[in-house]
Amino acid sequence: MASLGIRIIRFHFVLMAMLATMAASAQQLQEGDLLFSCTQEPNAITDVTSGVAHLPIDHVAVVHRIGGAQGPLFVIEAVKPAVCLTPIDTFMYNNPQVMVGRVNQAFDVHTSVKRCLRMVGKPYDDLYLPGDSAVYCSELVQMNYVLEDGSRVFETVPMSFHDSSGQITDYWIDFYSSRGMEVPEGEPGTNPGELSRRPMVTIIGSYHPE
């Protein structure tokens, strides 16, 4: 147990050093970058999913600069009540620790962002169901990021509502039961933590409080 504790402590310090280095050298945000938000406290999403470096990532948004290279930065994000454009300063204020991801494949940035923009105004999908008219945060990315040939950058993965023990958590059982539904465990979908771990995403920087 002592050696395990030492390994955990070492991992913590390595992770903090990595984040500090990345924050100091974070590159300028580019069109189509992905902003992964790390929650300050565990929640129902981070209880059943895990982000890059085991970070508690529970949201993702798409960087978009309005009006060309010198225009203001916004993010396109799926939040309640609907997909919207949010000024970058507002997003950073609401999400104080953000990991910056960049797709490392030759994808069609212009078309991908344009597809995301077409979703602005669509209702937020708090049921996380595939194939409906509503959209949740990582689904916005998964559905709309495309390669030059039109195929999707990100395939779906089986939805996870279970914790590390393999049991579906009480929160999600109660959440769906109150809506007269079964938990959609294993249905095709996505989540922001898993998206941050994809091999085609490189974490190139971070923003967090000093």
Please report, for each region that a protein language model flagged, where it lies by residue.
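N-terminal secretory signal peptides that target proteins for export/translocation
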Residues: 1-8
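Short stretches within intrinsically disordered, low-complexity N-terminal or propeptide regions
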Residues: 4, 19-26, 103
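Bacterial N-terminal signal peptides
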Residues: 10-21
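Cysteine-nucleophile amide-bond enzymes
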Residues: 26-210
